[in-house]
Amino acid sequence: LGLDNEKDITINGLEAIKKSDVVYLENYTSILNCKNEDLENFYNKKIFLANRNLVEESNEILENSKTRNVAFLVAGDPLVATTHIDLFLRAKKEGIKCSVIHNASIVSAVGITGLQVYKFGKTTSIPLENENIETPYYVLKDNLSLGLHTLFLLDLNPDEEKFVSVNDAIRYLLKVEL
């Protein structure tokens, strides 16, 4: 899927969904600007929400993929998040045929800011639980020393309605610096 709503999809993506027996929507690394029902109505498919536990701990998706045509929907580019890469590699290891359909991602969408993509350094995440974590601050510091921008991916937990806001991220960076 793209970054916005049910219509923000490539033609290849739409065709893959139509051919699928089972459709999962990963709903914990990003949030779309539409409801699950909007997706189901637009694609005319039942869509099962895939939380962190289902994707990272359970084998349900892989087991279904062995005997059925499964679509695994994510907002943005499917191989930006490490959890998606892990699922892809586990499927390959089990001999499950996979195809990846790329779409717009936050990495390309950041161009709307006017900043040049080639001037970005390492990307980092600011987790919800960041009490003793300093890596994001040092990624920023290293990027700044090289004259590069930093893209921060802000953690979220939709099941608990918890999100790292921009203000939270700034407070975190200031706390680590001081």
Question: Model regions: which residues?
Answer:
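Class I SAM-dependent methyltransferase SAM-binding "motif I" and its flanking Rossmann-like core
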Residues: G76-T150
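Generic hydrophobic alpha-helical segments
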Residues: G13, E57-I61, P136, L140, ...
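A generic structural motif
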Residues: L49-R52, N103, L178
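Predominant activation on well-ordered alpha-helical scaffold segments within soluble catalytic domains
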Residues: L62, I85, V107-S108, R171-L174
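Class I S-adenosyl-L-methionine
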Residues: L1-K97
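A contiguous loop/helix-start segment that scaffolds small-molecule binding in enzyme catalytic cores
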Residues: N69, S145-L178
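Generic secondary-structure signature for well-ordered alpha-helical cores
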Residues: V22, N44, L115, D142-S145, ...
